[in-house]
Amino acid sequence: MKYIDEFRDGEVAKGLAEAIRREANPARSYHFMEFCGGHTHAISRYGVSDLLPANVKMIHGPGCPVCVLPIGRVDQAIRLALEQGVTLCTYGDCLRVPASDALSLMKAKARGGDIRMVYSSADAVTLAQKNPDKQVVFFAIGFETTTPPTAVAIKQAAALGLKNFSVLCCHVLTPSAISSILESPEVRQWGTVPLDGFIGPAHVSTIIGSRPYEFFAEEYRKPVVIAGFEPLDVMQAIKMLIRQVNEGRAEVENEFSRAVDRDGNLKAQQLVAEVFEMRKNFEWRGLNILPYSALRIRSHFAEFDAEKRFPLGYASVPDHKACECGAILRGVKRPQDCKIFGTVCTPENPVGSCMVSSEGACAAHYTYGRYKDVA
């Protein structure tokens, strides 16, 4: 298949692996963070780490939207379904995220909550149209990739004059998060590993372009290479990062030029800016409260804001004591460093959110890498 098969070619991968080995200076080590969960999945699925020299290490980042969703936000969604009696719609990955009191949206559904999996925000709008006597709430999560469809849904609901549709907005921002990771006193206090550069996300960058990464590449002297999700994309990005480090450069380079340019999708950006504005603070699982790292619905569309329509409130809830999900999201620990990984915590019985989503570091390692821990 065009744009897939050629980026999974084994012979080319061998050549790239050799090129990376030649490029890497054996006298030093390299630590690169793949921010996006899609890259984490690709690295695990295709065994990219096994093709790298021993001194080139990949660190999992917090770029999995389900993984960074704090328990308190899931609790809000559950309360909407069980206490307010709304029809709650959300993406499939959200259904099994552990919440307070051993609950999840799936378990809340078993208790009688009207909770439905949808494939897009448009499905929730259609449901509200067909059920005018029911309050329908769309639990909106994700980075910049899924934000424009939510904006479209809100504008569509406004155009249709729907009074029974609202959105619980938990959309978060990639560049703000990376900057906050690099400068946050809480993160420094927790002690993250040293980072030599980032593999920038693919789908997010199709929306925002490469321009937003330039600030922290210049400000923090960390090179960034935006890469696609195929194994050869990732390997080429690693080679480009190693070369930047060796040459003392800290620039934003674009390996994924077949889909990403510097400016991104301007129409989508304008749409998001029309419907949403920055939140002053937002809690991320594992990263505490990060300033200006998430979006909320503008006052012009306040009638579609579930946080204003329903008496929700927000309470921060700590993670399970045995769960290392927070440390894994910060890049401090690996999935195999968690005592309950693969025993108490499995994809069938997730204790932490990193085991829930297919983009989560723990789920990826459980599926593709745990056999190496025993070998």
Annotated model-derived regions:
Residues 235-327:
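Internal helical hairpin/lid segments
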Residues 188-261:
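A conserved active-site cap/scaffold subdomain adjacent to cofactor or substrate pockets
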Residues 1-133, 147, 157-160, 166-168, ...:
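Metallocofactor- and cofactor-centric catalytic cores in central/energy metabolism, strongly enriched
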Residues 170-179, 264-268:
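Short, conserved secondary-structure transition motifs
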Residues 58-65, 165-173, 225-232, 255-258:
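A generic structural motif
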Residues 145, 151:
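Glycine-rich, mobile lid/loop segments that gate access to catalytic sites or pores
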